[in-house]
Amino acid sequence: MRDEVIRYLACPYCGGGLARDGGSLRCGTGHAFDVARQGYVSLLPGGAKGGGGDTAAMVRARDDFLAAGHFASLAADLARTAAAVAASPAVPGCVLDVGAGTGYYLAAVLGRLPGRVGLALDISKPAVRRAARAHQRIGAVAGDAWRRLPVADSAAILALNVFAPRNGAELRRVLSPAGRLLVVMPERDHLLELTGPLGLLSVDPRKDERLSARLSPYFGLAGRSEHRAALSLDHRAVGAFAAMGPAAWHTDPAALTARIRRLPDPVAVTLAVTVAVFQPLAGDRAPAGPATSSRPAPPARTAAG
């Protein structure tokens, strides 16, 4: 865990800053958190459940799928957008990815922002274990997006939210007034050639309404663009895609394999997402006290990417 990242963290119990103390991080009131040998630190408060986070098998599938480059054009587009809207390097702040998964998208963004460090936050310990080695300037933390984030007020100059939960109040609290929030969300036809035949979760038709409800009290839309690409996925890639999302929980593996075999090999697939840029609204930030939100019923991360 880099010291340049630790400065942006906050104790999940008292909200105080953290400092290195041997192999642990410790706040001024004595709460201590061990840094795992893989380089990440868990800042999930005692008793917090990790339900909904990716399992180790799901993380391996996601890593395989993304490492093959299927969504490389999206990662590059997101990185270009981040570089275009980021404040001057003279303005302090980290790049925070809430629901970072393996750290794939955060690593791409840091590649375009050489003066910044990144903070990957995810409820899944297997995910942050992988994110900790996604880029040399990433620090990885296990944390819950629906609780108070273990991040200092105004710590982030950029916040990323890629196919992940959105806690508007907390995103506003941790984002600098000069910062920007980048949200990636699927369009109705995103990977439609797979979701239907494989019986996977489809895109919520009310996604724009839900996004507005979560963010409009705290952020204003500064811009949006659509990213589309034609993909060709062989059956191995399709299997990895299915295994990295909620299908891994509720779909019979034998039935899923049979459905994949009925697809063309390779199969033509449409990548269709919106990249939206939000700026913090002027005025008071969200209150500094514990910020929680009821966890929605669906899993925290979809198979969108």
PLM region spans:
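Class I SAM-dependent methyltransferase Rossmann-like catalytic core
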Residues: G51-D77
